[in-house]
From Swiss-Prot:
Listed PANTHER family: 60S RIBOSOMAL PROTEIN L37A (PTHR48129), LARGE RIBOSOMAL SUBUNIT PROTEIN EL43 (PTHR48129:SF1)
Annotated transmembrane regions: none
Gene name in the database record: rpl4301
Designated name of the protein: Large ribosomal subunit protein eL43A
Pfam families found in the cross-reference section: Ribosomal_L37ae
NCBIfam families for this protein: eL43_euk_arch
Organism lineage: Eukaryota, Fungi, Dikarya, Ascomycota, Taphrinomycotina
């Protein structure tokens, strides 16, 4: 079976509807939400999205459930908050 879509990828299901720029944005989001991510607990690339904001590690013996962003495991706001908390903890320790 040959590859049917070269440029549009997963948004080929929309055909010519909704406009090219919207389909490009949807493609980026859908690729992010359907890909696998690295588990922060076991380190394997087995974290998959189960529902909006709920991510589950399917690794052997791990099976952890994570709360994250709707389309990706981590969001920009969560990353900045985590770095701020780490910096404040280092200031308190010193």
């Amino acid at each position: 079976m040959t590859k049917r879509t070269k440029k549009v990828g997963v948004t080929g299901k929309y055909g010519v509807r909704y406009g090219a720029s919207l389909r490009r944005d949807v493609r980026k989001i859908e690729v992010q939400q359907h890909s696998r991510y690295q588990c922060p607990f076991c380190g394997r690339n087995t974290v998959k999205r189960t529902a909006a904001g709920i991510w589950c590690c399917n690794g052997k013996g791990c099976k952890k459930v994570l709360a994250g962003g709707a389309w990706t495991v981590t969001t920009a706001a969560a990353t900045s908050a985590r770095s701020t908390i780490r910096r404040l903890r280092e200031m308190v320790e010193v």
